[in-house]
Amino acid sequence: MKHTCLSLALAVATATATLALLPVSAAFAAAPAAAESSTAPVLVTAAQWQQMASDGARYPWFAKEQARNKAMLEKMMKAGIDVPFPKDKGGGRTHEQHKRNYQALLAAGTLYRLTGDSRYVDYARRMLLEYATLYPTLGPHPEGRGQIPGRVFWQVLNDSVWLVNAVQGYDAIRDALPAKDRQTIDDNVFRPMAEFLASEPKNFDQIHNHSTWAVAATGMTGYVLRDPELVEKSLRGSRKDDEFGFLRQVDLLFSPDGYYEEGPYYQRYALAPFLLFANAIERNEPQRRIFERRDGVLLKAVDVLVQTSYDGLFFPINDAILDKGVDTEELVAGIGIAYARSGDDRLLSVAEQQGRLLLTPEGLKVAQGLAAGKAKPFDYTPMLLRDGPDGDQGGLAILRMGGERGQALVQKDTMQGMGHGHFDKLNWLFYDNGQRVVTDYGSARFLNVEAKRGGIYLAENRSWAKQTIAHNTLVVDEKSHFNGDWKVGEEHAPTVRFFEAGKDTQVASATMRDAYPGVVFTRTQALLQHPELGLPVVLDLLQVSADKAARFDLPLHFNGHIVSTGFQAERFVDQRPVLGRENGYQHLWLDARSQAGSDPRTLAWLLDGRFYSYRFGSSAPSQALLVESGANDPEFNLRREPALVQRVDGQRAVSFFSVLEPHGEYNGTAEYVHGADSQIRDLKRARGSDAELVELTLASGARIALGVADDSSADVEHTVSVEGRSYRWRGSHARIDRAAGKGDAR
């Protein structure tokens, strides 16, 4: 998937309304070049252009954005027009030049509409006439990638992105062109580009973000060219049978809550074509009520995307790049469109964080809201986001305490996520103090770095990043979930058992079947506050049962510098063995290994001035392995990151249990340390006839227990005893606190 083009896509969408702040004749902007109904702008109407031209300069955010885009375009115009024959892969010269060109086309159309300066029309006209000469001569790209190479770019996705953006600029100048030039450009650039996309079912007729870009490009071009056939194909699929197309994608790719199947990273990427095309549909066919489809799921998706971030960065599940966040250009479009339609002032605070807007009617509304001081803080809240078109294919559980930079626990109980999905059912991540504490590797990729295979996904994305051992979840017999076959994974989703989001207690639980033949595992995690603990702690219980004895590995990938290991282990200092041969194990160095034992152990590390104590145990004897990624990596494609692996051998059932405690402060500048010692004295797990319980003992002797029933649907009473202390509760789960010295608890 090529995000480099996308970035520019929105950069120029920002340009499509970007240059409005120059001194301008509103009257001229409203009626450029004697527009006719067959050539007048349809993606942004003449009346909307007029309002931006007359009002935009009064609003600082709009004015700043216009000035930025004007400077960008003038620099490109000064450099001259360059429409090279395509020959390079991603990151190469011709690839990057064609990206700059669609930026320029979009910006030129915007500037013309907002200033009336005919230089911008002439610049875009001359560039498009060069494309009209070039495009009919192009076959498959010489560096073609994937089943369907592009024409202008090495993968067809980039051709779609080019068209989405360039057609917006063309729409703005089309009525200002001589009829002969307009016909030449229609017939030799935009129509054949759209027809090429629509003629490739392996790209066009799919339920996938690549197809979203293709149908959006085709449909927007159809509106501009007044071609209802292109519009219908884009909405209903190339055969116009409603099996594919934009409407089907809206119905299948989002859950009722607005969660996108491939995860936040690709939700970000897909939002741009979804919302830009939806806006075009609304302008041209409002009777379709596209923004009301499925109870407004497209606008829900904008809110969900912000919710699936921490301190400005998206949760990096599945194929994701760690530094993508809410300031991404795709979401700039989303925030503008969502705010214009909803008036939700929380979105203005996100726009402030983004530091920019689009020069569109929607961007103008954002600028007006910001100028009026309407921005309200965005409320990041705990929530369960259902997955699947009907909301019954698992979900993403988000537990939060302490505000935007406080504690956030993410339990990934979602669908596979198609080809970009990782094999990590019931995986989890944890954030605290503005940092990634329990981590997900994301993808193995250097976006736009030509030296790293042109910026595409590296071989290590398959051999490491997608593999189960690269995540914080159960591995059986050193194999990945579904044996590493995502198509099998698509057929099996976790079952959400329960979700609770209280003030001091937040709990998520899910069960996974069929990730391995004959294996069922259930994970229950809680974020718990207590007056004697300075910060919330994470309690984790993972229960496994199998129909035959197996090796069970449970990794914990963490971020920080190890302070202490509370267990005896053999250290490999003279040589560094590799943990295994395949399925990601070949990329792990083994640094230390304990003997098998049943007593809980501890591991502590330091991250950004805060200590983290991890106390862990299992119901069967386990080894503790300290490992680091980066083995068998001759091209240095992998980051070196530590992990702890709990290993249980030769068992049919086991329960892993742990608590992660943030605490204390280290200040190297002021040379002090506070609260370096854990406030948790003991961790125990016990089993009743139909339930399990994990008990924490604090330094004062007070206890916190979490009881979890085997059957989450039954409203019956459960009893579990821990060293003579009985805990009773009714229902799926319960938190039970007990002061120091107290007896049985209910």
PLM features: residue spans?
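Cleaved targeting-peptide boundary
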Residues: A30-A40
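Aromatic-lined, polymer-binding surfaces characteristic
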Residues: P41, A46-A57, F62-E65, M77, ...
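Short, hydrophobic/aromatic-enriched beta-strand segments in well-ordered soluble domains
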Residues: L556, S613-A631, V654-Y666
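Non-catalytic terminal regions with compositionally biased, polar/charged low complexity
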Residues: L644-V654, L660-R746
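Catalytic and substrate-binding regions of extracellular carbohydrate-active enzymes
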Residues: R356-Q575, R652, P662-E665
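Extracellular polysaccharide-recognition and catalytic grooves
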Residues: D186-K425, L429-R436, E570-G584, L588-D608, ...
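Short alpha-helical hairpin
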Residues: K64-P86
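Gram-negative bacterial Sec-dependent N-terminal signal peptides
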Residues: K2-F28
